[in-house]
Each structure stands twice: as C-alpha cells, then as structure tokens.
Design a protein with these regions (language model features):
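Non-catalytic, usually N-terminal nucleic-acid engagement modules in DNA/RNA processing proteins
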Residues: 1-65, 71-72
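Extended two-metal-dependent nuclease catalytic cores across DNA- and RNA-processing enzymes
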Residues: 2-6, 27-31, 81-247
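Conserved beta-strand -> loop -> alpha-helix junction used to position metal-binding or nucleic-acid-contacting
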Residues: 11-16, 136-139, 143-144, 153-169, ...
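Conserved DEDDh/DEDDy metal-dependent 3′-5′ exonuclease domain
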Residues: 59-61, 113-115, 139, 296-297, ...
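Conserved "right-hand" nucleotidyltransferase catalytic core of DNA-directed polymerases
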Residues: 227-328, 342, 402-583, 602, ...
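Function-dense linear segments that define catalytic or interfacial modules
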Residues: 375-399, 403, 409, 563-648
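Conserved catalytic core of nucleic-acid polymerases
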Residues: 445, 551-554, 558-559, 564-566, ...
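C-terminal polymerase-core module
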Residues: 467, 471, 475-527, 695-743, ...
Length: 834
C-alpha cells in the first residue's frame, strides 16, 4: 500500500484506461434506459475511485491523445495505421469521461502533435528529478522505459505497482530504459511499430543481453544489419519523448475540490446509482433547509387539506407546508388516515402494512410519490426515496428524519403532480394506480395457502431423479464431472464425446440451453443434462425458496406485488416471483398443484384469452382481424388459411403453429431472422410469410408504421388509456438500439393496454366482492390471469361476477373472452378454465 503521507503524483493515460474500460464490457455492454452505451465511463470512474483510494494523491492529471497526427506519423506513414478505428460507442463517451474527471477536480491534459505518453513522460521525468514520487496508470508497454527510482507504473486492473525489479520479472530486461530496444526489435502490433522481421520477444531479449548497446547490436547482428533502417525507425517510434514543451508543474496538478452537483448530474443521466450512493457521504446529513419552504402558499399549491405524511415507530408525521405535526394518539391517527384530507406519501403500500400492525388503515384520497415518478418515466431502474430526491431536486439525502420526509413528500407532490397533468396521466394515476395500492396490499396480507406436504414430496422425488440422472450422465460420459460447470461440461461434450461444436464464448464452447437443444436429438446424454438442469432450476428457484417463505402462523405464502417493477405497466412479483413459474409442461403444473385453497374454499382462475391480439385488432382497426374475433373464429387457423392459401380443413397443425407464431410474433416485433430461427427455415422463406401476413392484415402494417412515426415525433408511446413510456432509443444512430426500440414501441400500446385492462377489472371486481360481502378475494395476478380464493357455497356467484366484469367491452366491438375454471388447487383451476 502506498503511504498516505508520501507526496505523490498520479498521472493517468486517459485513452489507455478508457479503451480497457470499454472492452472489459464488450460482450455485455452497459447501457442506460436511453440505450446509451456507458461501459467506458463506468469502468473509468470505477478505476478512478480505486486509484484515489489507493494513493490518496494531492496531485493528479489525466492525459489524453489529441486525436491529431504526431511526429511519429510523419516519420513512419504506417504508424498506428493497422489499429482498428475507435468504436463510435467509445468515441461518444470520451467527452463525458473528461467531464467526470474535471468534476472530480482533476486536471485534464492534451497537446496537439504529441501523444499522451509523451506529455505524461515529460511531466513525470521533470517531477521525479525533484524527488517527487510519480505513479503512472497505463496498460501501454512503452511507458515502462521511463521507470526509475521515483517513477512507477500502476496496473489498476491487476493492482500491481511496477518498479525496476518487477519490470525485470515481467519483461526480462535488466533496466526499464531497455523497453524501447525490446519494442524496436520485436515490434508492437498494437501501435504498428514494425520491428525487425523474424525477431520475436525471445530473440529480442537474447540480442539485448548479448550486446552492450543497441548501436553495437546494429553493427554486429547479421539480421539487424540487413534491416538496420527498419530497426532504427522502430526505435524512434518506440522512444517516449521527455522534452515536450509544457509549463505544467506540481502547482497545476493540485487536485481541486470536486463538484458534487456536476457529478450528481452526470451520474444521474448515466444512471450510475452505486456511484450516486457513494456521493451521499459528501452531502449534509439532512437535506431540509427552511429556505426551501419560504413560499408557504406555493408549497400548499393554493389548495387546502394537502398533507405530506410518514408513519414510523407508532407515530404519524404530517406536514401541510405551514404546520408540522407529530401525532402519537392512536384515535387521532385513525381519524386523520380515514379523513377526506389529501394525503401524500412514499411507497404507500409498505406504509399500509406498518399501519396494520398498529391497528390502523389508510383511506383514499392519497398520492404516492413513488408511483407518480414511475408513471412519468417507467424505464428507470430504481424509485427509492433518495432516487426521487436526486432526480427531481438534485438532492442526495444521507439521512432524512420522519418529519423531513413528510415535508419532502410535499415537495415531490409539488413537482410531480403538474407533470402528471401535463402528460394526461391523471386518470391512470387516480383511477387505476392509486385504488390498486390497497388491493395489492390486501392480496399480500391474504396470501395463498401452500401444500407443504406436496412440496416436500416433490423435493424428494427431484433428489431421487437427480441421483439417477447423474449416474446415467456419468456412465455415458465415462467420467465423473461437475454437471453445473459450463467449462467441465463443454470439455466432456466437445472434447471427450466429440459432439458437434457450435457457438464459442470467451471461456470456451457454449453449453447454453439453445445449443444443447440442437444436440438433444442425436445424443441421449444431452437430453439427460437438459432434464437435470430443468429439475435443478425448479428445485433451487421454487421448491426450496418457497418452503422458506411459508408463514408459520398461516401456512401461506405472502408474495410481494410490485407496482413499479416494469416499463409496460404490468405488475411483477417477488418472494416468490410467480411470473417465472413455467406456464406449460409437467413441472409448471406440479408447482401450481402446491397452491391450494383452505378446506372450506375453492380457487377460481380467470384468464383473458388472446387479449393482446384483441387489443391489436382494436387499435389497428384491422377489419379482418376484428371480424375474426367478433365471429369467434380461430384466429390462428384463419391466418393459416390466408397465409398458406388453403381451406380450413386442409391446414395442418404445423401450419397453424406457424400462423400462431406470426400472429403473436408481430406484436413483439418478430423479425424474419427470428421466425427463420424458430422454424428452421431460410430468412427469405420467413420474410415471405411475414410479408404475406402483413399483406392480409394490411391495416396492422399501416398501424405499425404510424406508431413508429408517432414515437419519433413525441419520443414516447401511449396505451389506449393514456399510459406513457419514453423511447429515447428511437433517435439512436446505433442500428441495434434503434431496431430494439421500434419493437418495444410497437409492443407498448398492446401490452400496456392489457395491463391497464386487467388492473381496471381488478379494481371493479374487488369493489363488487366487498359490496357483496364475500369472505375471500383476489390472491394472485400473473400474466393475463387472476386467481381468487372464494367460499365454496358462493363459488358460482363469484364466477359469474368475475366473468361479467372482466368481459366488459373495454375494446368497444372487439369482445374480450375470459376463461374461468375452479379447483382445489391452482393447476386444476387453470386447466379447467373455459
């Protein structure tokens, strides 16, 4: 570790670090919600933080290449000519990297006509002569030549500081200055330093050790004599200049105070939440300052009865912008919560759970700042209170008192509600999302009964099957190995068993499910491996975790439903994630069998049939599509008859499946390549099928084009009911980002409207079931399905009520069809739905 007391200078080779940072994520680039590649900036900042922590320097600079030709290009035309062009995604990040460095208070340097290495070396040598320790951060070999008693190279990725001794260990040269000779002889492919033909690193080292100087080697070595001119040019190219004219000294390199507001703005734009959290340590402990609330009337928005609130530790903290109150009397808390006062809170569903423990309930009207922020931009990754304060006010609260949070909720309301009104989101907010909060809270409280015995039996069965599969796999492989290790599995399949190799990854040949599925037909061992993976995932993802989630007192799982978890408006769930339970197949069915009703109740499954295709028919106003649904036709069969030009009775099952894939695929932006891959046909055949489809349902094709144009015009998409989703990627130059955005933009009005419809149905069903005094109610919402637990003696009444509400004509003349089934467990209820 570097001594904190030591006066030291850190000089960073900016381009070198930016390149390494960018390519560290090349297989899985980091992007923010706008589709912007942020890999280089993230990696650079991460390294910068590590460097600052390790060296605690008082003096520092980051030096960049100017991007212009240098004296080396004039000397040797081919210099760096073979280096691939800098990727556009990296070039676009360099200005932001420089901005971040400056915001950290660190000097940014570049000089036209010289490379960063030359400027860096000049400054380093000048300071080292005065006894200052200089640490150079780079991955370039050429800078090793200036290492001396006071100059060191630091590899930030390997966390190694190179001095003379370590340089000798790494490169085999007795003195770091010999690095230029090594590069001159062996060449450097990265910088296109030619070197001497036929001489590699080993031979170059041999020459360096044999002769006392480079000049002697040129005179005596036969190969060098033959290529003397090339060797001399290579040595000039490899020699770092240490005499660049610059007035930069220690004073200019002093680190200034970092600009937290600038860093917050940049990190917020890039969505670097981990870095933002770290910045909070530099912020004051509290964020509330009286001046924020000087204009009392403005805070109250000229409306009476608007209160920010926070419930904590059996105390209700409220604020109306003028008065702060701390209510501890339970009756008064109840009175306030049930009043007609407009209550503004954050994550109100969580507040409801806390209030229930205290014996209180919260009644409408209320405004949830978290949900409002999500509605305005559902593409952000996080909606924690600190994120909202940062995003809206550039404030980074480290610690907020309960009183302050009540006040800050009012600030957020003041900022968010006008935006909600501007984007026409008030109906979505007040008529759908706010009433839904209490329904989800009650679903979480209600939970769902679990057949623990069945889950235990299933776990035992899986363990037995895993043992059998392992034995079979080892016998077929002829060796025991770790089946869960992709590297070991690849070695067995592709090296030992000589199975056909497919796509290659960084660590070897791929063994992902798509690859194994291709091999399964010809290799029984692969079928066993796929089955082993399938049941292992079932065990580790569902059976084992679920048993740990069962509440001992109730024998029920109390899943968490997340209102702000998706960009489409759909609900998500966690603890457990019900969305990921397999819909089809034996395993999905077995898990659903474990979700049961109490002895006196039954479960009702209500599932929308083809809701997304029906929405597509409605919003595209395609006559053929609408007609099929109005006449209750088999839409996939109808599509198949038209695409393949056959009468209905001549259409094969395979052709109907292709039509189904195209029908649904077009909602999700299925490409000809995607269809070709799924069906095992050529891209041209797939293109013809899609063109045929769009020719038949031409109004769908027109609607798709209209949606793309509207999204380009506004930058966001809308559902039937007005839910919005920003699509900044629609303006992207990167083709991959643009095409991905187009697919999402086409899908949003369909999937988002489906989310709105099921939420509207949930609200109305909940109200009706309460009006009619049902004991049970909704327990699960997943995909397009609702699951209810209802008393047996009222099951028919509940079925009729649910079906009637869910089938309402939200889509005018396009009917919504709901399949309803009942059973003692979820699997039976789902399977009997019709």
């Amino acid at each position: 570790m570097v001594s904190k007391k030591e006066k030291s200078v850190v000089l960073i080779d900016g381009h070198s670090l930016a390149y390494r940072s960018f390519y560290a994520f090349i297989r899985n680039p980091l992007r923010n919600s706008k589709g912007q590649n942020t890999s280089a900036i993230f990696g650079f900042v991460n390294s910068l933080r590590k460097i600052l922590n390790k060296f605690s320097p008082q003096y520092m600079a980051v030096i960049f290449d100017s991007g212009k030709e240098t004296f080396r290009h004039k000397l040797y035309e081919e210099y760096k000519k073979e280096r691939p062009e800098t990727p556009g995604d990296l070039v676009s990040q360099l200005p932001l990297i420089k901005e971040v460095v400056s915001a950290y208070g660190i000097k940014v340097l570049e000089k036209e006509g010289f490379e960063a290495d030359d400027i860096l070396a000049t400054i380093a040598k000048r300071l080292a002569k005065k006894g200052t320790k200089v640490y150079i951060v780079t991955s370039d070999k050429d800078l090793f030549q200036i290492i001396d008693e006071n100059i060191f190279i630091y590899d930030v990725y390997k966390d190694i500081i190179y001095d003379k001794e370590k340089t000798k260990e790494k490169y085999g040269i007795n003195d770091p200055s010999l690095m230029r000779d090594l590069l001159a002889l062996a060449g450097d492919a990265i910088d296109n330093i030619p070197g001497v033909p036929g001489i590699g690193l080993k031979r170059a080292l041999d020459i360096i050790h044999r002769y006392s100087s480079f000049e002697e080697a040129l005179e005596k070595d036969e190969r060098l004599k033959e290529h003397r001119q090339l060797a001399e040019i290579s040595r000039i190219l490899a020699t770092i200049k240490t005499d660049v004219k610059t007035k930069i000294g220690l004073k200019e390199l002093q680190i200034r105070k970092k600009s937290i507001p600038k860093l917050i703005k940049i990190f917020q734009e890039l969505e670097f939440s981990s870095f933002l959290k770290e910045l909070s340590t530099d912020m004051p402990k509290t964020v509330y300052q009286e001046p924020l609330f000087k204009d009392k009337a403005h805070i109250a928005l000229k409306r009476k009865g608007i209160w920010g609130f926070k419930f904590s530790n059996q105390t209700l903290f409220v604020c109306d912008g003028e008065v702060d109150k701390k209510i501890t009397d339970k009756d008064k808390i109840k009175e306030f919560l049930n009043s007609s006062e407009f209550k503004v809170g954050f994550d109100i569903k969580s507040q409801m759970h806390k209030l229930k423990e205290f014996g209180c309930e919260l009644a409408l009207p209320y405004f949830d700042t978290q949900i409002a922020a999500w509605l305005l931009d559902p593409t952000r990754k996080r909606y924690e209170f600190s994120d909202l304060m940062l995003h809206n006010f550039k404030l980074m609260p480290k610690m907020v008192s309960d009183t302050e949070q009540a006040r800050l909720n009012l600030m957020l309301f003041q900022k968010l509600e006008p935006e909600i009104l501007t984007f026409g989101l008030d109906k979505i907010l007040y008529e759908i999302e706010m009433p839904l909060i209490k329904i989800l809270y009650e679903m979480e409280e209600r939970g769902v009964k679990i057949d623990t015995g069945l889950f235990k039996r299933l776990s035992t069965e899986i363990e037995i099957e895993k043992i059998k599969l392992k034995k079979s796999i080892y016998q077929q492989a002829g060796v025991e190995f770790n089946i869960n290790s992709p590297q070991q599995l690849a070695k067995v399949l592709f090296e030992k068993l000589k199975l056909p190799k497919t796509k290659k990854t960084k660590t070897g040949f791929s063994t992902d499910s798509s690859v194994l599925a291709e091999l399964a037909g010809s290799a029984p061992i692969v079928r066993d491996i796929l089955r082993y993976r399938e049941i292992t995932k079932l065990q580790t993802t569902y059976l084992t975790p679920m048993q740990g989630l069962i509440k001992h007192e109730t024998g029920r799982i109390h899943c968490q439903f997340n209102q702000t978890g998706t960009a489409t408006g759909r609900l998500s769930s966690s603890n457990p994630n019900l969305q990921n339970i397999p819909i089809k197949g034996e395993l999905g069915k077995k898990i659903r069998e474990g979700f049961i009703a109490e002895p006196e109740n039954l479960l009702i499954s209500a599932d929308y049939s083809q809701i997304e295709l029906r929405i597509l028919a409605y919003i595209s106003n395609d006559e053929k599509l609408k007609e099929a649904f109005i006449n209750n036709e088999d839409i996939h069969l109808q599509t198949a008859t038209m695409v393949f030009n056959k009468p209905k009775d001549k259409v094969t099952n395979d052709e109907r499946q292709i039509a189904k894939m195209v029908n649904y695929g077009l909602i999700y932006g299925l490409s000809d390549y995607g269809l070709a891959s799924s069906l095992g046909i050529s891209n041209e055949e797939a293109r013809n099928i899609i063109d045929e489809f769009l020719g038949i349902y031409f109004q769908v094709a027109e609607w798709r084009q209209k949606i793309i144009e509207q999204t380009k015009e506004t930058g966001y998409g809308k559902t039937i009911f007005g839910r919005i989703r920003p699509f900044p990627g629609i303006f992207a130059q990167n083709r991959t980002i643009y095409e991905s955005t187009v697919r999402a933009a086409i899908n949003h009005p369909i999937q988002g409207s489906a989310a709105d419809i099921i939420k509207k149905a949930m609200i109305e069903i909940d109200q009706e079931m309460k009006n009619k005094n049902f004991c049970g109610g909704m327990i699960i919402q997943v995909h397009d399905e609702l699951l209810f637990e209802v008393e047996k003696n009222r099951i028919k009444e509940a079925q009729m009520l649910i079906k009637e509400i869910m089938s309402k004509n939200y889509l005018d003349d396009v009917p919504l069809v709901v399949n309803i089934g009942i059973g003692e467990n979820w699997a039976v209820a789902h399977e009997t739905a019709k």
